[in-house]
Amino acid sequence: MLDSLLDNDFYKFTMQSAVIKRFPYARARYAFINRGEHAFPPGFGEQLREAVDAMADLSLSVEEKRFLERTCPYLDPTYLDFLSGFRYDPSEVDIVQQGERFELRIEGLWYRTILWEVPLMALISEIWYRMGDGKRDADAIIDMRTRDKIEHYKRLGLKIAEFGTRRRYSYDVHDRVVASLRHHGGDTFSGSSNVHLAMRHGVKPIGTHAHEWFMFHGARFGFKMANSLALEHWVDVYRGDLGIALTDTFTSATFFDSFDKKFAKLFDGVRHDSGDPLEFAAATIAHYERMGIDPRTKTIIFSDALTPERVERIDAFCRGRITTAFGIGTNFTNDVGVTPMNMVIKMTEARPEGQHWMPVIKLSDVPDKNTGDPDMIELAKRVLALSRRA
């Protein structure tokens, strides 16, 4: 079902390169979380198993390597040589189905297992819809809907990227959407998080890092040091490139405590992925002003469950105060007349070199999105004094 090693989100490759350089012997475990309590039909696990096993045959083509060399100079030749030899190992993925319940777990060296999450979620979504009764809208309707959205954003003068790999309806729908965005978007469409589709449609791959980068640092170095060391190590690897920092792994308030003048000047901006976007924008603007930095020289990328209405409201609040860009996922790639799946695959445990397995957690700006061991979540809240903040 997947035809390219690059049918994945860009930040997985940028993180993989950083993990190889900083934590080559670390191990990781991930688990599927069925937030929407979806029921899985008989035979679902077997079909997913077949698709996962087939991923062992994927490899980086010569043309794909040249695309990365040309487009992403911060991915050094040593890493691209590694990626040329990389093959998925399906034995790292354990799939169990009992009745309508479905479980998936991943375990292995972090630099290897880091690539599984996004394609697995895309496969889960596509197989689930294919086996279900729901019928999607016709291609012409999807094309028209996508065109109308990007033309609306164009009239507002915005920068829009497509971030919809994980919960896409299918690869074919995803491909149609990116083609339509490319055709109608002009300068408004800044690129896609999906590296394969960015290459296929001649646009820029977009992304920096995800929550797991910070989650691992919390396990390895402690919650108080997690944000600052995650940022420091990112800078050590990329030397100022890939300069958008994700804020909400241990709450944005905790992040800004670590986002001192050095980081605030060095990073191009921050990404909002949970909580009230207007409150976040106001807090970000205030933080830059306290640092003596003109917020208009910095960028917030908004990427949390965006719709045209939400985007317009955020733009109205931020315009003239701070630069904005928007990463839109499910509203592009699964707005096809069905209910999108509500699921995630998250890192659950990490074993840094020379240490034992330990739980990793995420403390979102929305408590319902917290993930990880409940006791560890409570410990982190105490260590970070989050109860006193509330």
From Swiss-Prot:
Keywords linked to the UniProt accession: Ligase, Phosphoprotein, Pyridine nucleotide biosynthesis
GO cellular component, one term: cytosol
NCBIfam families, alphabetized: NAPRTase, PRK05321.1
UniProt modification remark: Transiently phosphorylated on a His residue during the reaction cycle. Phosphorylation strongly increases the affinity for substrates and increases the rate of nicotinate D-ribonucleotide production. Dephosphorylation regenerates the low-affinity form of the enzyme, leading to product release.
Modified residues (Phosphohistidine): H211
Name this protein carries in UniProt: Nicotinate phosphoribosyltransferase
HAMAP family named in the record: NAPRTase
Enzyme Commission code(s) on record: 6.3.4.21
Organism: Chromohalobacter salexigens (strain ATCC BAA-138 / DSM 3043 / CIP 106854 / NCIMB 13768 / 1H11)
Primary role: Catalyzes the synthesis of beta-nicotinate D-ribonucleotide from nicotinate and 5-phospho-D-ribose 1-phosphate at the expense of ATP.
Pathway(s) per entry: Cofactor biosynthesis; NAD(+) biosynthesis; nicotinate D-ribonucleotide from nicotinate: step 1/1
Family in the record: Belongs to the NAPRTase family.
A GO molecular-function descriptor: nicotinate phosphoribosyltransferase activity
Catalyzed reaction equations: nicotinate + 5-phospho-alpha-D-ribose 1-diphosphate + ATP + H2O = nicotinate beta-D-ribonucleotide + ADP + phosphate + diphosphate
InterPro entries for this protein: N/Namide_PRibTrfase (IPR041525), NAPRTase_N (IPR040727), Nic_PRibTrfase (IPR006406), Nic_PRibTrfase-Fam (IPR007229), Nicotinate_pribotase-like_C (IPR036068)
GO biological process: NAD biosynthetic process via the salvage pathway
Stored Pfam families: NAPRTase, NAPRTase_N
